[in-house]
Curated annotation (Swiss-Prot):
Pfam families: RAI1. It is found in: Nucleus. This is Decapping nuclease RAI1. Its EC number is 3.6.1.-. Divalent metal cation. Decapping enzyme for NAD-capped RNAs: specifically hydrolyzes the nicotinamide adenine dinucleotide (NAD) cap from a subset of RNAs by removing the entire NAD moiety from the 5'-end of an NAD-capped RNA. The NAD-cap is present at the 5'-end of some RNAs and snoRNAs. In contrast to the canonical 5'-end N7 methylguanosine (m7G) cap, the NAD cap promotes mRNA decay. Also acts as a non-canonical decapping enzyme that removes the entire cap structure of m7G capped or incompletely capped RNAs. Interacts with rat1; the interaction is direct, stabilizes rat1 protein structure and stimulates its exoribonuclease activity. The interaction also stimulates rai1 pyrophosphohydrolase activity, probably by recruiting it to mRNA substrates. GO terms for molecular function: 5'-hydroxyl dinucleotide hydrolase activity; enzyme regulator activity; GDP binding; metal ion binding; mRNA 5'-diphosphatase activity; phosphodiesterase decapping endonuclease activity; RNA binding; RNA NAD+-cap (NAD+-forming) hydrolase activity. Substrate binds at residues 197, 214, 236, 260.
């Protein structure tokens, strides 16, 4: 039988040992513009500058230019960018796994996220993840949720996050930006089509990874030398913490915040704490590397970053030994289940995971 099952439990077996981690380093990047058109390069790079507080995140909701995320993009933009880099350098980008950051976040957080499930497809050209099916399912679940009386809608709460980003970003570094531009950010139309996507080379245990993912902003400027780390900033919003229950909810959020930033090598996260009406009253700066220790020693200890990393290393090693031949494979974890199933859904081909242009390029190079 093709495939197999990996049990996350008992997680105690992932405790203690220190997995070797290769620091994520950006090897290339790409951008989507305001119409979500793909471009090589950093044209959509944005710069962080502190927003004015209090900040009303509801403002402009009626003019929100929202990305249509129903389109099936697979790995096309990521593979296009890797192909351009290989043509430029004359060297192949070697990796065991090429995927989006969102897919790896689900795997990394799985030991402490029993409630949520995921599905992704993979193929053995190099193992590659694609997240369209999962996104469609997630959207349906959100639409069917009934919000408690007095709570903002899911759409409005999603908008709050994008509004917060708009209030925190500049199109160029602070120094040459006119004061009027900085102070008029509250009036900008929010558009989440434009994105800067970093492509990094990293490693967890013996698995070499190339991961692509959106980055919100840079703290200062990108360094001239590619070897130097980049002072990326991830922007998040969260409800004010009023009691112990809120603290546990926030800690669980921190797991995702940490995993997303850890995978791309983002050193700093800025959280805007908002009330139930969508008004941000305070900011908190978090160092990504210190979050697991903070949760362990100062919080309720709801998760352990070391266990996440050790689990990811073991699971990816198992995945490589399970998916060793062509065809399309499904990687699936059901909600409230500790089992990750891997099974073949198509005997041959790559199931549209890998673009024709990339297949042609690799067969020639």
């Amino acid at each position: 039988m093709d495939g197999g099952t990996f049990d996350i439990q008992p997680i105690g077996r992932f405790y203690g040992s220190n997995t070797t981690i290769r620091r994520p380093r950006e090897i290339t990047c790409f951008s989507y513009d305001a119409e979500h058109k793909f471009h090589l390069g950093d044209s959509s790079l944005r710069y962080y500058y502190t927003p004015r507080l209090p900040a009303d995140l509801n403002r402009g909701f009626d003019t929100f230019q929202k990305l249509d995320d129903t389109a099936d993009e697979h790995l096309d933009a990521l593979l296009e960018t890797i192909m351009a880099l290989e043509k430029e350098t004359g060297k192949r980008c070697e990796a065991d796994i090429i995927t989006w950051r969102g897919m790896m976040t689900k795997i990394l957080t799985a030991p402490f996220d029993n409630l949520n499930g995921f599905e992704m497809n993979a193929t053995c050209f190099q193992v590659g993840g694609e997240n369209n099916l999962y996104k469609i399912q997630q959207k349906q679940i959100q639409e069917n949720q009934r919000m408690p009386p007095g709570m903002a809608s899911q759409d409005l709460m999603a908008y709050w996050g994008y509004k917060f980003e708009t209030l925190c970003l500049l199109q160029q570094p602070w120094d040459p930006t006119p004061r009027a531009e900085i102070e008029s950010r509250e009036d900008l139309v929010v558009n989440n089509n434009a994105q800067y996507c970093s492509v990094v080379r990293t490693g967890i245990g013996s698995t070499r990874l190339i991961i692509g993912g959106e980055v919100d902003a840079v703290w200062d400027c990108k360094p001239d030398r590619k070897e130097d780390p980049i002072n990326w900033v991830e922007l998040k919003t969260s409800a004010e913490i009023r009691n112990d229950r809120d603290m546990i909810k926030y800690e669980r959020k921190l797991l995702k915040f940490w995993a997303q930033s850890f995978l791309l090598g983002v050193p700093k996260i800025i959280v805007g704490f908002r009330d139930n009406h969508g008004i941000v009253h305070r900011l908190e700066e978090l160092e990504t590397a210190s979050i697991p220790n903070k949760v362990k020693k100062l919080g309720r200890g709801t998760w352990d970053g070391n266990i996440c990393i050790n689990f990811a290393a073991a699971f990816l090693e198992w995945l490589k030994s399970t998916i060793k031949e062509g065809g399309t494979w499904r990687i699936r974890k059901l909600e409230k289940s500790s089992l990750i199933q891997v099974f073949k859904i198509e005997e041959t081909g790559t199931g549209d995971i890998i673009s024709r242009s990339f297949l042609d390029w690799r067969s020639r190079s």
